[in-house]
């Protein structure tokens, strides 16, 4: 659509429901598929990076995700594991100061979602333990799965749906 000169917009109160994966395996395959889709879109529509439009910034922003996911997977996760054994070569005690900020950002996003759901007449259940688990551990699963998806697409591996 953008290549044809059409505009896209942002709907801040858009609300959509879908079927979520039932198992970790399905979830990981879904994340890999979405990551492959990002690389595929960048390969097919790279010209959009050079069109002078406001939305071009967001396309450039997508170029950061593979890099950030790769650094998180190859440096931060091993750094956490080493830190658990007292080896602070990559991640040190000061990293713990970032955790409250991460929890705050996740809580702010949760608050915005609760407000939006309330406006739609929907109820969000409270699950503090689930929220903490999500905020602290979700990325430990998400980023490595995404990196595998990026590599699969770059190497032109056979695509599989993988969620059925």
Where are each of the predicted segments found?
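Short, structured coil/loop segments at alpha-helix boundaries
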Residues: 52-58, 87-88, 92
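Non-transmembrane catalytic domains and loops of membrane-associated enzymes and transporters
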Residues: 1-56, 64, 163
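Hydrophobic alpha-helical segments
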Residues: 26, 37, 43-44, 51, ...
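Generic hydrophobic, helix-prone segments enriched in Leu/Val/Ile
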Residues: 5-7, 59, 95-96, 124
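Membrane-embedded multi-pass helical conduit in multi-pass membrane proteins
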Residues: 65-155
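Membrane-interface alpha-helices
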Residues: 13, 151-164
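Hydrophobic alpha-helical segments of integral membrane proteins
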Residues: 24-27, 34-38, 42, 60, ...
């Amino acid at each position: 659509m953008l290549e044809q000169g059409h505009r896209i917009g942002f709907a801040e109160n858009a609300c959509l429901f879908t079927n979520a994966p039932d198992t970790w395996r399905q979830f990981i395959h879904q994340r890999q598929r979405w990551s492959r889709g990002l690389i595929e879109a960048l390969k097919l529509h790279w010209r959009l990076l050079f069109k002078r439009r406001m939305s071009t910034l967001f396309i450039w922003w997508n170029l950061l995700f593979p890099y950030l996911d790769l650094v998180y997977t190859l440096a931060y996760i091993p750094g956490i594991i080493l830190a658990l054994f007292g080896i602070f070569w990559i991640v040190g005690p000061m990293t713990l100061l970032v955790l409250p900020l991460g929890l705050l950002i996740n809580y702010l996003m949760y608050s915005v979602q609760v407000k939006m759901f309330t406006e739609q007449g929907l109820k969000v259940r409270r699950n503090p333990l689930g929220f903490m688990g999500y905020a602290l551990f979700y990325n430990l699963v998400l980023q490595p799965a995404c990196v595998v998806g990026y590599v699969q697409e770059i190497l032109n591996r056979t695509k599989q749906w993988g969620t059925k």
